[in-house]
Amino acid sequence: MITVRRSASTCLRLLAAVLLLASDTAATHAAEAALHLKDNDVWVMAGDSITAQRQHTNYIEAYYRTRYPKLRLHFRNSGIGGNRTGSVLARFEYDVAAWKPTIVSIELGMNDVNGPEDAYLKGMKDLIAKIRAIPAQPVLISSSPVDDGSIMGDWRSPRCEKIHPFTEALKKLAAEEKVVFVDQYHPLIDLWGKNRRKGAEAVAKKAATQPLVPATPAPTALAAGAAAPPKALPIPPSLIPLGGDPVHPGPVGQTNMAAVILAGLKADGEVSSATLSVEGKVVEAKRCQITDASVQGGKLSFTRLDESGPWPIPATAKTAITLLPETLKLSQYLLRVTGLADGQYRVSINGKPAATLNARELAAGWNITTAFAGALNDRAVAIAALITKLQGPLNTDWRAASKLKDAEKLAAAQTAIEACEAELQALVQPVAWKFEAEGGGLGYRGRLLA
């Protein structure tokens, strides 16, 4: 046996080298567990019926397309109702891999909780391996909660309760596999549950006789030999309705989901900001250009050209911001006007009314994302319509042809998708907006808006 003697300084150098290696390895793993979109990325969003609704997934797509208009990004919906991990594995080749993705997100669990946790984790692990073999980057997204009035520790249905340990187990698996993971269950369960409970309190205070709606989550197949789950408790009304049903929220709930997922992906919240004085001078312009600024006839006007666009949140989902104000952190599209006299000011964009704000609101900074009427909303509606077309009939045609291995129909479907994407790419490019603000004391301090 050979004994090697080392000095204390040598041992310290070796220890430092080991620590440095460990640090580099950790940094590498941390880098692997991040999502950074690049030009020509193809993101396949695989999931169950909640993904197949094409709501929160479309909202996420709208965020990335408007925030990074110079990138050519491609999003592909791959959701099917009732799916579990095994279902996605069975259709993986023609419905996921066939898209030639660079990113694949897996959003499952709502149906998997009717089976054992081990099967869910094994399925997820197999999906990670398949995604990496394509090769593409896997992203794991937990199931959303059941909107039945459950909060942590006080669940109203066994189904919603069971998603909790499944989410914790998925988080652990993602850490072990060094995979990007987003937990939407825990940020949403108390938000939605308290919203239901506040709704019940409001009804009780008004002594309303509104009957409670029985819990009727979407039916799912039970695992072989599994017993039917216990019946859920009656569902109270929501203070702010999410739309849809307890398992499949509508636009408000789906906007909450999209916001939580984007926050979990550490999406950039800054769009642009501009500050002007009451005299029409440009004080600051960040990520935008301000031109033709002037004050004439009691009206402040200027032209604004942004580097990117705000998140086009649907007007039908504007109460999602009331329910989750942090949503606006993902779309900081700001206008400040300093030195205004007290009063109300009408703001228009491209000649269409956008908002009526007071001097304090404009001084603090108005987030223009909340202009749910006018020119910006017109653009948001147009973007949403094209994404709906892309992820609806065009997506369906492509997937049907892929499943049948019909090369001719697949080529035609691909051509249609590319044409729609070209139109969408043109639509999300920055455009100059003409802003006008009048009222209060612009040009004639002290005179209030009638």
Where are these regions (language model features)?
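Conserved catalytic region of serine esterases and O-acyltransferases that act on ester linkages
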Residues: 38, 200-450
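Solvent-exposed loop/turn segments at secondary-structure junctions
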Residues: 49-52, 80-85, 110-115, 144-148, ...
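N-terminal secretory signal peptides that target proteins for export/translocation
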Residues: 1-10
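Substrate-gating cap/lid alpha-helix
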Residues: 150-184, 210-211, 215, 227, ...
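Bacterial N-terminal signal peptides
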Residues: 11-24
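Serine-esterase "nucleophile elbow" of acetyl-processing enzymes
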Residues: 30-81, 91-100, 257, 347, ...
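Active-site segments of SGNH/GDSL-like serine hydrolases
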Residues: 107-111, 127-163, 184-187, 194
